[in-house]
Amino acid sequence: MSSSPSIAQEFLATITPYVEYCQENYTKWYYFIPLVILSLNLISMLHTKYLERKFKAKPLAVYVQDYTFCLITPLVLIYYKSKGTVMQFACDLWDKNLIVSDPKAKTIGLKILGIPLIETKDPENVKAILATQFNDFSLGTRHDFLYSLLGDGIFTLDGAGWKHSRTMLRPQFAREQVSHVKLLEPHMQVLFKHIRKHHGQTFDIQELFFRLTVDSATEFLLGESAESLRDESVGLTPTTKDFDGRNEFADAFNYSQTNQAYRFLLQQMYWILNGSEFRKSIAIVHKFADHYVQKALELTDEDLEKKEGYVFLFELAKQTRDPKVLRDQLLNILVAGRDTTAGLLSFLFFELSRNPEIFAKLREEIENKFGLGQDARVEEISFETLKSCEYLKAVINETLRIYPSVPHNFRVATRNTTLPRGGGEGGLSPIAIKKGQVVMYTILATHRDKDIYGEDAYVFRPERWFEPETRKLGWAYVPFNGGPRICLGQQFALTEASYVTVRLLQEFGNLKQDPNTEYPPKLQNTLTLSLFEGAEVQMYLIL
């Protein structure tokens, strides 16, 4: 027999005197509030014990206690987020035992605003959530707190809606689409102008990368670049027609995403953060997208077929004429197309600027493959030749290991189920997961786990990707998620990041960082990861 009856008997023995007292003072209804809370906790406890017996699971090995009625945890997270250290705090929970008492624990239980959560960095649990037990988990509240900005798109939908979105979008990321690197070159020429104007002085290259990727992403998605890099500081003006809301789009998009990240921390209480500035930003973003959607809808099927070149929105308009569907999918892909690549490039050049030996080794490979400076053979850079650059791939892999684009995510159980690890001695036994329970997985912590990557897990070392152990990582390395929801735009992001890196190292022979720059850097986590304080670097021309 289970221990549940003894738990119940002990509970009843504890509360019986209290119940008798409440009966004598029945007019004072508030005496019953603690009784209700205790009863609900007992029911939850008994349900957990029942599931553990049913699934042959063990109790969670590590549970974080919050003695402030679960109110302090979200405040702590919001504080650290405002300082750019929330993701470092998430890693320190495990590595420095800030809250987790067992240094070997990879799965813990905690509560936020009274809501029980599971937090894991265990690759086996990540594999279960994303792949082997995919149908046991859904996006939960993600649709609710992202809907106001992204609507019903591939990143917010579950079930049949998600499958339909994926079927509709998959052809748009076929190899022939993502391999057209030559479309990036005009944007690179403008980027070069911005870097040269600093004459070797310190500047924030992250800000330029975000402008570069929004320009290239809008050209790919809309057929018309936002041309945010073309400004008076480099003697250029946009060549495309201006319209109301265009100039405000980038700032509004950034603000709305930042606000969404805070809503994520509050989980079911996300609706608290819905201020006027947030709503105004969303309206600007929607107006920007609607402008292009309307232009696409004004084209007949015959017009669309006659269009030369590839434009994501036009191809999508051949499948649906619903303006909301077009806007929602467009914004979902724009988040990934702009932010993922910009973040990757920013972290890559941040690390190269403080690791001159890695920078030199990468330039040597690029010189051998494509030449440098006046001898650069730009016409030889292609999807195929970029894939043959082994050290470049290692540098990108290492960047995505230490700084994964989506460092923290969650799912919600759709049924009573289990996770393979986290219970019993050493946390190696299965644990029971209740229907509706939130399970968070922190890929940033997985990618920096010393049990997996060794004592130098926090060190930027691309050479590890040539070692036999690293080639057997499996679910310990998932920079683009995994399973059925693996990122459709993975090759798009990797190809663009590779091309930009090669072209910058062909053009600039020196890359430095202020020796007083803080390390590890503070991290900004909105829907994707970026540098909280930018990437301040110095770049010099090849002479």
UniProtKB/Swiss-Prot annotation:
Residues the record lists as binding heme: C487
- Listed EC numbers: 1.14.14.-
**Functional summary from the UniProt entry:** Together with an NADPH cytochrome P450 the enzyme system catalyzes the terminal hydroxylation as the first step in the assimilation of alkanes and fatty acids.
Which residues are on the Lumenal side of the membrane? 1-28
- A Pfam family: p450
| Domain of life, per lineage | Eukaryota
Can you supply one Gene Ontology CC term for this chain's record? endoplasmic reticulum membrane
Q: Which family does it belong to?
A: Belongs to the cytochrome P450 family.
Instruction: Kindly give the InterPro entries that the UniProt entry links to this protein.
Output: Cyt_P450, Cyt_P450_CS, Cyt_P450_E_CYP52_ascomycetes, Cyt_P450_E_CYP52_fungi, Cyt_P450_E_grp-II, Cyt_P450_sf
Tell me the GO molecular function terms. heme binding; iron ion binding; oxidoreductase activity, acting on paired donors, with incorporation or reduction of molecular oxygen, reduced flavin or flavoprotein as one donor, and incorporation of one atom of oxygen
Gene symbol here is CYP52A1
SUPFAM superfamilies reported in the protein's UniProt record: Cytochrome P450
Key words of the record: Endoplasmic reticulum, Heme, Iron, Membrane, Metal-binding, Monooxygenase, Oxidoreductase, Transmembrane, Transmembrane helix
* Topology of this chain in the membrane: Single-pass membrane protein
Q: Transmembrane stretches, by residue range? A: 29-48
**What is the induction note for this entry?**
By various alkanes.
**What protein name is recorded for this chain?**
Cytochrome P450 52A1
The record's section on PANTHER family has: P450, PUTATIVE (EUROFUNG)-RELATED
Compartments, as annotated in UniProt: Endoplasmic reticulum membrane
